[in-house]
From Swiss-Prot:
Task performed by this protein: ATP-dependent agmatine transferase that catalyzes the formation of 2-agmatinylcytidine (agm2C) at the wobble position (C34) of tRNA(Ile2), converting the codon specificity from AUG to AUA.
CC per GO annotation: cytoplasm
GO molecular function, one term: ligase activity, forming carbon-nitrogen bonds
The protein's name: tRNA(Ile2) 2-agmatinylcytidine synthetase TiaS
Keyword Mitochondrion attached: no
Effect of T248A: Decrease in activity
Keyword annotations from UniProtKB, A to Z: ATP-binding, Cytoplasm, Ligase, Nucleotide-binding, tRNA processing
Organism: Archaeoglobus fulgidus (strain ATCC 49558 / DSM 4304 / JCM 9628 / NBRC 100126 / VC-16)
Gene that produces this protein: tiaS
């Protein structure tokens, strides 16, 4: 029989990675029980959830086995051996879903990616469909485990994750930084968001004590294998390609889908600038827009680097569409579309038609005159200010991009101002 296995919340800030644990489980299945079908899936969930470990990702994979009970036992053994169970914030969960049942979990998965779920909701679904499951400690991982099985990917990308040898876990990673930039130069945009040229950073290598050496994102298996062959690193213990919802904007809720805004959700909102950008201590930039929901504060925080310079050019009356997550009643910007620029006019003293110099005031209520030619004029001139900003899409650099946020290179839109 064919069964989807979903696993989540096995890691902590001190180590482990659910993708790595899933790979270990897949290897056990292949050795002892049956076979794994296709690539595993890495499904990123709501990025604003406060109790996430790092990227809030859950894993699922499809297997063909004779005995589900034996499958449950093997996965449980892997979790007990490798999950960070001694961390109070780690609460693993795993589910075992018949392949034909998986489609019924789509509504739950959609909510896990866009909304906020409680463990009771996961337990209700498990009870409704009599789903075999594993629940360690609080079992919060059951939410992600179900979502990883039920998510339907109309759009998807791939990620090749290379893992370190266990004896190297927690030590400094060894790699040739230049080789990653060379790889990107050669393969972009078939691979993407692996380096940040603007800020000279390799972004596909974590700085946590987890088993991951690097995770290269791309659009095809062929491109990922080429990338793997071209980068220079310490020896790789094992590797796996995951099908994922990275870079899809799957977390965004359109303004037409809701009647009110809530914290810990991500939105796409259109509005008109009502309060011009201002900086606060720390280099964060804020502005406000008027939307169908009322006034909404938006922010480009310091890690977005050059993107803040775009935001600083906004002016009152500009029409924009913002993309980002809401926390503390503020949209944390991931990208922005400048839909329409407001016309800005200034009044200046007229120019002398004879000599081309700017005229001076002739006195209160007496108009203007040229000091040299004595030419006179009655009124000031209204001049349109040339805006530095252009309509189109602007995005944060790769080093500040969230897993789910779709980079402009993957968007078929006009006026893309790509940070690479």
């Amino acid at each position: 029989m064919r069964v989807w296995v979903g696993i989540d919340d096995t890691d902590s800030s001190r180590g482990m990675c659910t993708t790595y644990l899933a790979v270990l489980a897949m290897e056990r299945v292949e050795r002892e029980l049956g076979k794994v079908i296709g690539f595993p899936r890495l499904i990123r969930l709501n990025p604003t959830i406060p109790y996430k470990t790092r990227g809030n990702g859950a894993v699922s994979f499809l297997v063909e086995v004779d005995d589900v009970g034996e499958l449950v036992d093997v996965v449980n053994e892997v979790i007990i051996e490798h999950a960070m169970l001694d961390d109070e914030k780690t609460n693993p969960g795993a589910v075992f879903v018949d392949e034909e049942l998986a489609v019924k979990l789509k509504p739950f998965a959609d909510k896990a990616i866009k909304d906020v779920l409680q463990i009771d909701e996961a337990l209700f679904v498990i009870g409704k469909y009599f789903i075999p499951h594993l629940r360690h400690k609080k079992g919060r991982g059951l939410i992600g485990a179900l979502a990883a099985v039920g998510a339907e990917l109309e759009d998807f990308t791939l990620e090749l994750i290379a893992y370190r040898y266990p004896e190297r876990f927690g030590t400094e990673r060894e790699y040739d930084e230049e080789s990653f930039f060379d790889m990107d130069y050669e393969l972009y945009p078939q691979t993407f968001d692996n380096v940040d040229w603007c800020n000279d950073v390799v972004v596909c290598i974590p700085n946590t004590p987890c088993p991951v050496l690097y995770g290269i994102r791309g659009e095809s298996v062929e491109a990922l294998y080429k990338a793997m062959e071209s980068v220079k690193t310490e020896p790789v213990d094992r590797r796996m390609i995951f099908v994922t919802n990275h870079a899809t904007d799957m977390h965004l809720i359109g303004e037409e889908e809701v009647h009110r805004l809530e914290n810990y959700r991500s939105y796409r909102l259109r509005g008109r600038v009502t309060l011009e950008p201002y900086d606060i201590e720390g280099g964060h930039v804020f502005f406000e827009i008027d939307t169908k929901f009322g006034s909404v504060k938006c922010a480009a925080f310091e890690p977005t680097k050059q993107f803040r310079n775009v935001i600083r050019l906004l002016r009152k009356g500009d029409v924009v569409e913002v993309y980002g997550s809401m926390k503390k009643d503020t949209i944390n910007l991931e990208k922005i579309q400048i839909v329409e620029l407001a016309e800005i006019w200034v009044e200046k003293n007229p120019i002398c038609p004879s000599c081309g110099r700017r005229m001076e005031s002739a006195g209160r209520g007496q108009g203007f005159r040229c000091k040299k030619c004595r030419t006179k004029a009655d009124e000031k001139l209204r001049e349109k200010v040339e805006r530095e900003l252009q309509p189109g899409f602007y995005e944060v650099p790769p080093s500040a991009r969230r897993h789910l946020s779709k980079p402009l290179i993957r968007m078929n839109v006009e006026g893309r101002h790509i940070f690479r």
